[in-house]
A protein has these predicted regions:
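Small/polar low-complexity and glycine-rich loop motifs
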Residues: 1-204
Length: 204
């Protein structure tokens, strides 16, 4: 491609609503099942679910929210997922059922990401697509290895970062960084033979 000057964008970046969550966890196969006919789900009752985990998400205005997933083993190799949004149970959001292969411990259902809608007070609803495809069920304690939601609040630029491969990023106050370009790098067989000609320019 054409080599040209790198232009670093300045100013703010707008908020981006969360739309996807990649979630990877192991569920303990030895956990006792909870009978939903006698113990209905209640987020305030820890005996009504097996495990829980919270994710931070953002709405279209950049407001921060919390989505908590409550996992309940309901029978052998079957788990139910209920959700709260900012601490409130979501009566209009159906539970997700996770089913695992009894021989391999790998997820067999659902085979595609699940989209869950959460209503906000002032911003557009958050349609969050949750991918459980890499979850497992083995005889070891509940553990989460990936809890990655996209989205972020609006932010101001606060710096520039250059990676080892020459990629140049603008960095922002919300922790995001955006690629601006890449510095052309070259390797010289005799670095000691380089001669400085001006500033950061060298000749061999």
């Amino acid at each position: 491609g054409t080599v040209t000057d790198i232009q670093i964008k300045t100013g703010n970046i707008p908020a981006q609503a969360s739309s996807s969550l990649t979630f990877t966890a192991n569920f303990d196969a030895s956990d006792a099942a909870i009978d939903r006919t006698t113990v209905p789900f209640d987020a305030t009752n820890s005996s009504s679910y097996t495990d829980s985990y919270t994710t931070t998400v953002y709405d279209s205005l950049g407001n921060e929210h919390s989505v908590c997933q409550y996992f309940t083993k309901t029978s052998d190799n079957t788990w139910e997922v209920q959700y709260t949004f900012d601490g409130q149970q979501q009566t209009g959001v159906p539970a997700t059922t996770l089913t695992f292969d009894p021989n391999t411990g790998k997820l067999t259902s659902p085979t595609t990401p699940q989209t869950i809608e959460f209503q906000t007070d002032a911003a557009a609803p958050i349609d969050l697509t949750v991918d459980y495809s890499t979850c497992t069920q083995y005889g070891s304690e509940f553990s989460v290895t990936t809890n990655a939601a996209d989205g972020y609040a609006s932010a101001t630029q606060n710096g520039v970062q250059v990676d080892d491969d020459g990629k140049v990023y603008a960095t922002y106050s919300n922790g995001e960084r955006m690629l601006q370009g890449q510095v052309v790098l070259a390797t010289f067989p005799n670095e000691n033979g380089l001669e400085a000609v001006s500033g950061t320019a060298w000749v061999q």
